[in-house]
Amino acid sequence: FFFLMIRRPPRSTLFPYTTLFRSQVIQKLYEASIGGVQVELIVRGICGLRAGVEGISENITVRSIVGRQLEHSRIFWFANGGEQQLYLSSADWMPRNLNDRVELFFPVESEEHIKRIKEILDLYLRDNVGAHMMQSNGTYRRVTNKATPVSAQSSLYEEALLAAAADKIPMEVRLRPMYSKDSKE
């Protein structure tokens, strides 16, 4: 399914990962790039793909955003022939997750949720504080520009704090684990 979706025009896709290392997935992304698909990846950790290589991956960009939080986004946005589709997944696309575990990959159908997730993705694409872009030689260069600083993680963290304060949730409750070894539940 995933491999069919990345080939449908208009040709653009966006995927945030923690890790991208599976050779079959990387090969299909290369094939999509060669076919003219614009692929934007946000890969926080290990990335076995090489972006921006002429004739192979010039239509692929890889950005890494490292900040205060360790995130595990698994969002897949497909332009899908003009009918945009958004999916969420429970796994990074590493062999151990795809071969040895039961994982979920499901569509987001609520327009309200789609809108919110796209706002978050846009925020990550505008990040110019913790973002680094992969160069064609595999190294990363920090995103620098003179625009107003944008930190996706800080913005989302502050938004969550404001929402919790508006709900008048005490700090000790907000930061307490729901389950611990001492839980009665």
Predicted regions mapped to residue ranges:
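PLD/PLD-like phosphodiesterase catalytic module centered on the HKD motif
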Residues: 18-185
